[in-house]
A protein has these predicted regions:
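Long, intrinsically disordered, low-complexity segments
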Residues: 5, 85-160, 267-299, 323-331, ...
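Extended, hydrophobic/aromatic-rich amphipathic alpha-helical segments that build helical scaffolds
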Residues: 1-18, 24-64, 99, 175-177, ...
């Protein structure tokens, strides 16, 4: 399907699509097609062939050259700083996005609120359950703010968070720009006996109060400058201090689910990816908290192209230029530049740091052979490795379809 349909279609698109501009949304442009061509050609590596890797590198280099020379041919661009990429003011006309998509909702376009709020729902997926602490509550007012209040379903693994620890022991600057680690109270709150016990506070905390707007929750990493000071007052402070070590077990590379004889309540609080946060909503039904996120989601952006070039260079040239591509991304982020030769794992780790939460990881691990057995997961996420089967590298055709026809087995993904 790559050879006969996907790649020829993208080559045709590169030739015939318009250049577009930064305001172009949903409709693909020439740079979108070229970026996807680079990505798709690289993905064919999972089939143990280098046939399309030269085309992947060539497409990536065209965009890189254009980006570094002003973008006159394709409009390629990379923001000078990492935080500009996900600043909400840059969302609608994001210069770095090679392709982005926005949904529309409004009273002129929908007569019912039954489904018109189901737009870009990425903002609903990554927030930890801050409402497990009484100074926070899930309400409509908070849902419309950038920090939000709806608990998500995606929690960073121990492995992911430790990718942000640099060789000198400091945190990669992208960590605190990508993850929210503290929240203010959105209601008045008074500590009670139950909360004291749940969070290991001293007896004197009972009766102490937090007012709306006060610091309520603070997650601290061992690499933070104020880590020791914050941990030293964990049982006395009138706000909730969550130590990384209360949530993650570095030795076992997993999440700590039990504390003493009971549940570990700290596990509900973890660094929460904020790339998809929004304060731009269409309110379909306020009483039911049905709000449609009007922000765009980025399908592919320029920083990824440098990492595609790095990986393709490893396959074709032994990585002679790979570290240079990787360090372009790191330099923009303000991270420590890497030295030595780059391996595929070097690229994978950098993709984890730069592209976390941008829905690339499954394809990255599949492409690089990390799903051939459970060894990669055993080293990075052993709790998950116990349940892994090689067939999980394949996407199944839904049984809703296959069970509804007499010859459904013929349509299942071969090998699943």
């Amino acid at each position: 399907i790559y050879k006969e349909i996907i790649i020829p279609d993208l080559e045709f698109a590169v030739e015939w699509l318009d250049k577009g501009n930064d305001a172009t949304t949903t409709q693909p442009t020439k740079k979108a097609a070229l970026g996807m061509l680079a990505k798709v050609c690289l993905q064919t590596k999972e089939y143990a062939t280098d046939e399309y890797i030269p085309e992947a590198l060539d497409a990536a280099k065209k965009l890189i050259t254009d980006c570094e020379s002003g973008g006159s041919t394709y409009g390629a661009y990379m923001y000078p700083t990492y935080e500009e990429v996900f600043a909400e003011k840059n969302n609608k006309e994001n210069k770095e996005a090679l392709w982005k998509h926005r949904w529309y909702a409004g009273s002129d376009g929908h007569g019912s609120s039954n489904g018109n709020f189901k737009l870009n729902r990425n903002d609903e997926k990554f927030l930890c359950n801050i409402n497990k602490f009484g100074a926070r509550e899930d309400n409509q007012t908070s849902r419309l703010t950038w920090e939000g209040s709806q608990a998500g379903i995606f929690m960073p693994t121990q492995y992911l968070l430790n990718l942000y620890v640099q060789q000198d022991g400091t945190l990669d600057p992208r960590f605190h720009k990508s993850f929210t680690t503290q929240w203010n109270a959105n209601r008045n709150y008074e500590w009670d006996e139950s909360s004291k016990n749940n969070f290991g506070k001293e007896d004197a905390i009972v009766g102490k109060k937090l007012n709306t707007g006060d610091l309520a929750i603070k997650i601290v990493m061992p690499q933070d400058a104020d880590y020791a000071a914050e941990v030293s007052k964990k049982v006395t402070a009138n706000y909730l201090i969550v130590d990384y070590k209360d949530v993650y077990d570095d030795a076992n590379k997993n999440v700590i689910t039990e504390r003493g004889a009971g549940e570990n309540m700290f596990r509900y609080f973890y660094p929460s990816l904020n790339k998809h946060n929004s304060s731009n909503y269409y309110v379909a039904n306020a009483s039911k908290k049905r709000n449609g996120n009007l922000n765009a989601t980025f399908i592919i952006r320029m920083a990824e192209i440098y990492l595609i070039a790095a990986e393709a260079d490893i396959y074709l040239n032994g990585g002679a230029n790979a570290m240079g591509y990787i360090n372009k991304v790191r330099q923009r982020a303000g991270a420590t530049l890497l030295t030595g030769s780059a391996s595929v794992r070097t690229v994978l780790d950098e993709r984890g740091r730069e592209l976390c939460g941008e829905y690339c990881r499954f394809y990255d691990l599949k492409r690089t052979g990390m799903f051939k057995d459970n060894s990669y997961l055993q080293a990075t996420h052993p709790d998950l490795a116990r349940y892994f089967k090689p067939e999980y590298a394949l996407r199944p055709i839904s049984t809703t379809f296959t069970n509804g026809i007499n010859n459904g087995a013929e349509y299942q993904n071969p090998g699943y």
